[in-house]
Amino acid sequence: MNELVGLNKLEKFEDLDVESSVLHKSDSNDLEHHASLFKGIELESIQLSPGAFEGSVVFAAVDRISIHVSESVQAIEQCMKVDQDKFLFCICLCDTCKETVFGVQGAGSWVYVLPPGGEAIAPTPTHCPVLLMTVQRDALLDSENLVPDVANWFKTLKKDGEFVSSLRLANRIQDDALMTLQSAKAILAANETKTAQIIHQAMISSIAAGFSLEWLEREGFAVIHRTPALDRFLKARHLLADRDLYQGGDGDDELSKLGSKRSVEQAFSEHVKMGPRSYARIVRLHNARRKLREERFFNESIGNIAAQEGLRHRSRITANYSKHYGALQSATRRTAKRRN
């Protein structure tokens, strides 16, 4: 993936030798395959910027911790759902990024924490590396290094989590993750279960200590509150996903309830670099693409699938699809039809 750029903190992870039975790297030109590599998280990704997808993930599982360092050439939006027994920690590894990442600014200086069963919409701009790490719930909450107030904070997190504003904490977790990945390469190639448990315990203890020290110094966490623009974007995004509402002609009326037309457009521009209409077209195009790739739809025509998603002009769907993703998958579908 020659076009991917190693920026700032990402460079440390790119230096890892990943030829290991435990530590892996995958360069992918398939968005769905890229999303499937994340453990402890259910991801559905939407490609926001055009071009054949290029992404990279370095990942490892050490006992009950899973670490992923991800980057893609394209801007993407990830719909994240955390497993019921995991906490998810997210850090942007590009501390010079001026754009919003996961809906907030100040990239590189915060830790986004999602609770077990948590959900989030996470837009990331082009060439934006992120660290996603899942930790087993009980292992973290039972840590001796977690002070009671912090344990209670973790237990009472809302479903959409919190952004903890702390460059020191972000750097500490990033360094812990790097150390764990290095240990996974150096020690765990022989699948030594006991060693994995030791590394896991050290990682849990360090995470717990980092959050506890941050809390004790500040007498609480400095959190980044979601802006009205982010709230407006998320609500408008939900409305645009309602195909029946939009095809019925009520979409603009519903969007107008969220604020002025300009404020809604600014909210979309800030978070996904496009207006609501363009975003809606990309979501419908994404849904059509997903159906085109599913075997149960192979006997349906491309025109019918496009119409189901509100893309009613075959010539337009072909042109838009080719511009955004590359050539339509006609050959794949013809092969599948013959097989069936």
Language-model regions: role of each:
Residues E71, E77-Q84, V101-G103, A122-T124:
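Short histidine-centered beta-strand/loop micro-motifs
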Residues N2-L48, T96-D244, D250-K261, M274-G275, ...:
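Alpha-helical bundle regulatory/interaction domains
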Residues V82-C97, M133:
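Short, conserved beta-strand element in jelly-roll/cupin
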Residues V264, F268, R316-I317, Y321:
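Short hydrophobic/aromatic patch on the recognition helix
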